[in-house]
Amino acid sequence: MKRVFIMLAIVLGSAGLLFAQKSNQKEVKQLQSFLQQKSAKGDANYIRLGITDIKNPAMWKGVVWSDGRAISIDWKDKELAGELDLNGFTALQKVDCSRNQLTEINVSNCTALNTLNVSRNKLSELNIDNCPALVKLDCYKNRLTDLSL
């Protein structure tokens, strides 16, 4: 039984190390920056998401990774707040951050992004420059004064 447990620990530890080596560090740092910002409830965004280890992207709830790149973010209705910078996430295909209190989101240069839902936030501007794959955009119930296409 001890051997099985030790082998399992080694295998799982190796998988986490492999993910850390393969992951796009720029994307990880940008997401970590947002996760550490204050949520609408006053604690950190990562706490609202139930994330216990901010240094382990493989365990982040709501983020789907493929080949070390974020391809989907689903953080709908989590009482998140602050500024989410996804600029340059070229593998990202879908984002749903609706029903939060985001004040800014930047998805420019997300060339694979096809679906973006940022409805019911506190956005005053939205930059979706160079998002040629975008076919669905929901941004109603914000405070938009500027939409950059």
Residue ranges with predicted function:
Residues 2-94, 111, 132:
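N-terminal capping/linker segments that flank leucine-rich repeat
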Residues 65, 145-149:
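Short intrinsically disordered, low-complexity coil segments enriched in acidic
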Residues 72, 83, 91-96, 104, ...:
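Conserved LRR concave beta-strand detector
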Residues 78, 100, 118-121, 139-142:
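Consensus "Asn ladder" position of solenoid repeat domains
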Residues 99, 109, 130:
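Residues on the solvent-exposed faces and adjacent turns
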